[in-house]
């Protein structure tokens, strides 16, 4: 189930898209419950995408075991578009599984979203709550921790 963590981080960022048009330049940086991956969500042409801007050492190690050189810079969210009712749908790349699957995101409020990713036609799903973070204060905390 840890393999879904990256997926949910990306999906969480998508929840802000519900209240922002697909043409929006920047929807912020989002993180999952364990803060091991942070994803920046932005418009990419006619849709929305999410790219990893931070990964913990463990998340990076897991990605390397799957054949990636680095997790940072990977586009995990692709072709996300609003579906109505405060939701979005698109494709999510899961590096640790080496698969792209369908994902949804539901915008709860300006700083909270619920992300869901499923495999096997929806037979196995996992959902998490993600939060939007203040990148400047987080960067300061990262520097002071080291």
Language model feature labels by segment:
Residues 1, 22-26:
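Absolute protein N-terminus
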Residues 1-10:
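Bacterial N-terminal signal peptides that target proteins for export
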Residues 14-22:
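C-terminal segment of classical bacterial N-terminal signal peptides
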Residues 26-27, 33-102, 135:
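Central antiparallel beta-sheet cores of small beta-barrel/beta-sandwich binding domains
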Residues 31-32, 119:
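Non-cytosolic beta-sheet module surface loops
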Residues 89, 98-105, 110-129:
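Surface-exposed interaction patches
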Residues 119-146:
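Edge beta-strand at a domain terminus
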């Amino acid at each position: 189930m840890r393999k879904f963590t990256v997926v949910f981080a990306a999906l969480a960022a998508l929840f802000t898209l519900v209240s922002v048009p697909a043409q929006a330049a920047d929807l912020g940086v989002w993180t999952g419950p364990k803060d091991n991956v942070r994803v920046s969500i932005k418009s990419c042409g006619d849709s929305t995408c999410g790219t990893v801007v931070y990964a913990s050492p463990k998340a990076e190690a897991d990605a390397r075991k799957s054949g990636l050189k680095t997790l940072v810079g990977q586009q995990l969210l692709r072709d996300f578009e609003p579906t109505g009712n405060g939701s979005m749908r698109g494709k999510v790349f899961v590096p640790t599984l080496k698969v792209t699957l369908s994902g949804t995101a539901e915008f709860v409020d300006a700083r909270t979203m619920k992300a869901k990713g499923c495999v096997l036609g929806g037979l196995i799903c996992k959902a998490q709550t993600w939060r939007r973070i203040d990148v400047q204060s987080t960067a300061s905390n990262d520097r002071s921790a080291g």
